[in-house]
Amino acid sequence: MTTQDLLAQYGPRESMEYDVVIVGGGPAGLSAAIRLKQLAAERDVELGVCVLEKGSEIGAHILSGAVMDPRAITELIPDWKEKGAPLTVGVTEDKFLFLTETGSKSVPTWALPDNFKNHGNYVISLANVTRWLGQQAEALGVEIFPGFPAAEILYNDDGSVKGVATGNLGIGKDGEPTENFQLGMELHAKYTLFCEGARGHLGRQLNDKFKLREGADPQVYGIGIKELWEIDPSKHKPGLVMHTAGWPLENDTYGGSFLYHMDNNQVVVGFVVGLGYTNPYLSPFEEFQRYKTHPAIRAVLEGGKRVSYGARAITAGGLMSLPKLVFPGGALVGDDAGFLNASRIKGSHAAIKTGMLAAEAAFEAVQAGRTSDELTAYPESFKTSWLHTELHRARNFKQWMSKGLYLGTVMVGIEQKLLGGNVPWTLHHQHWDHEMLKPASQCKPIVYPKPDGKLTFDRLSSVFISNTNHEENQPAHLTLKDPSVPVNVNWQTYAGPESRYCPAAVYEFVKNDDGSERLVINAQNCVHCKTCDIKDPTQNIVWVTPEGGGGPNYPNM
């Protein structure tokens, strides 16, 4: 049944009114909520603010490296140390290695551009920092609704955004209501801030409806895959931050790794692959597993135990790929717009800062008696902020690196180290990631080694330790515009790339009795990384929100 059918039979939906509704309980959304309530307290005015979060709890779906620049969180909550923020492991040492298959070359610290240096930053679990931000928001009176995904944008008669509706509960696989059916709820607001993270489901719709991407470069993405390990205490160096480039990726494939030493004898190890890669046989997950076999990495992990796993797409386009940030009734904030600084491999500080800027614009608009118009003060304040300066200096990073590791490294070194990012030229992204795959007939198949179950693993055992769970009796949230495309186009032309780019074994080609192929979608495995929505060559796969509370539950990630 369609939404309209359900409303006709079971409606109308209940509704709640707020001054500001925030979609997404990550660092951007929670920072916006906190800033709104801070301003309301300073002015001694009432302000209704709510946050919708699709995860089962705040932090459940948050995955990042992460090394945090504390500049933005210090602006938001100056006494964060006294309030117990989980930023406790300061960076003690930076290492950067270029890897070959069996060797490595270390870059001296003095030769690293400033954007690769992390003195004054903290090795964190962004999931735990987000949980702490949630506590700060609730203490200020923000209403937070975990397990309630925003599934639909609501519009006023004049076309401006009115708010959002949460997803229905109790729809069966056949699309019909079950005995547990409940209609979603409408949340109306004067302004709605969309903070869904990279490749936001509703953000995509807003980009299309309001033509927000006109004049912007294509957005480009990476897939980040991460594991949490407990290692031998004798190998543990709290605060050590290591990045690598090179092997196992080919020169023309953008990507690299991170290995951060946290507290409690734990390290996080991860791998990022740019989704503009061309060979359909490439598997980002398998490249990550192969990377861990390098002597420099094996030496750290061997004898340890893998604790958790996750994956998430990240925006990498930078300043030139930012869309228009505002539209009548709302704004895109954080990675829903694409504020991550790829040259620093950091986005949490940008999410917090843009959350604050959007909140300040929304607060002033509400106090002025405005509603449902464009929050033009938000992009204006961004353009005069330190964040804009930072992103402007790094605006060519991804473009240079997409030209190959060697040329990219030289040019980034010249721009960032010698010239401090102050260059008169600007490079542009020309293509979307989904346009980049070559036909399989033009590419060399890649044979990956089998996992050993100690250092390297398969995808199903990895998904298991991501604590991913979905209600089984619900429609698949990975939808196909045309069910014939996976076999007739993706399998025949590209050798079924969705079976490789997905880090959770969601997509599986199996043989029918007559020997033909068909695609099976194991939606219950989905870790909500959004890679399929980005990389599918014909954009036939569309990720939509599953029933609330579904997906991963990342501890300490």
Predicted regions mapped to residue ranges:
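N-terminal FAD cofactor-binding segment of flavoenzymes
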Residues: 46, 54-103
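Glycine-rich Rossmann-fold phosphate-binding loop(s) that bind the pyrophosphate
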Residues: 25-26, 126
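Extreme N-terminal leader/targeting segments of oxidoreductases
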Residues: 1-21, 35-50, 171, 469, ...
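N-terminal Rossmann-fold NAD(P) dinucleotide-binding loop
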Residues: 29
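FAD-binding beta-loop-beta segment adjacent to the flavin cofactor pocket
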Residues: 311-342, 462-473, 486-501, 508
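Active-site-proximal substrate-binding core of FAD-dependent oxidoreductases
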Residues: 338-344, 356, 360-405, 520-522, ...
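Predominantly flavin-linked oxidoreductase catalytic cores and closely associated redox partners
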Residues: 45, 127, 131-132, 136-299, ...
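Iron-sulfur cluster-binding cysteine motifs and their immediate structural context
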Residues: 492-523, 530-553
